Amino acid sequence: MSALSSIDFSGFQRQGFQRLEACISQSQLNVLRQVAQAFHVNWERDNLDFYQSRAVNSAYLTAPDYLDNTQRELLFQFIGSQLIKDVISPLFADCCGFLNTQLFFNPVNPDQRNYWHRDCQYHLSLAQQQAALTGPLGLHLRLALYDEPGLEFIPGSHKRWDTEMQLDVRLSQAGHTPSDELPGGMLVPLQAGDMLLFDANMIHRGLYGMDRLALDILFCDPVPELLQFAREDCLPDTRTLESLVWPDAFTVTANMLKNCGNN
């Protein structure tokens, strides 16, 4: 067990998010910073126009595209560690699958505005988005690699549909824009080494500024409608899998992709 094995997660269940302070050692933080920065440099080189025009995040860090095998191994060992198991397992009724990794950073344009959203709005209709609030869980585990402004949430929106204003803002309707202020928002700043758990379906927005560089690890209930977005090349090989303290989330995803024929 890790130091996080006895945490009360009632705050997450009630609000849809929960911050865990000072979760990892400075030495482990330094290792993850180096891996994330190496990925970012290589990813930026191949996505320069996108990065300079509007990007605020990248994805698929554990794929072989931008990291070498040693760097990928470091990420797999962290994701499959006792620490991550102790944080993630209590939030799922049975088991969970590994979905993806993302890296969040500041936009190049200092005038670029942040935006309220639910993650599911980019692939579901409004009716499907509303139904998703009682459906499978998609979970972000964010690790702040440096001090950052964090995120802003509408507490409880992981279980509650939008008010008229919230819907107008996040969908740019009725003269609103997704960067407009919303009443009831809760700011959650992060310090380096903090973790932040939040439901992907809740209304939230990232806050830009400072030295924002955050590693997100996404987990979900083991259902095809969510794991269809996972990629086989982002999973560890058999040798690495057998070395992990907690290989379960990777194994669940590998089996689901195999059964669905998704390569």
Task: Map each language-model feature to its residues.
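Non-heme Fe(II)-dependent double-stranded beta-helix
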Residues: S2-R14, E21-A127
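Non-heme Fe(II)/2-oxoglutarate
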Residues: I7, L48, M195, N201-N263
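Double-stranded beta-helix
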Residues: S10, T134, G138, A144-I203
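A structural signal for short, well-ordered beta-strand segments
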Residues: T101-L103, L141-L143, L215-F219
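Short edge-strand/loop segments of extracellular domains
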Residues: N106, H158-W161, F219-E225
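Short, charged/polar surface micro-motifs in flexible loops or helix N-caps
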Residues: V108-D111, Q121, Y146-E148, M195, ...
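A short secondary-structure junction signal
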Residues: D111-R118, S125-Q128, G150-S157, D162-Q166, ...
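Active-site glycine-rich loop that binds ribose-phosphate moieties when present
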Residues: C120-Q129, Q173-G175, E181
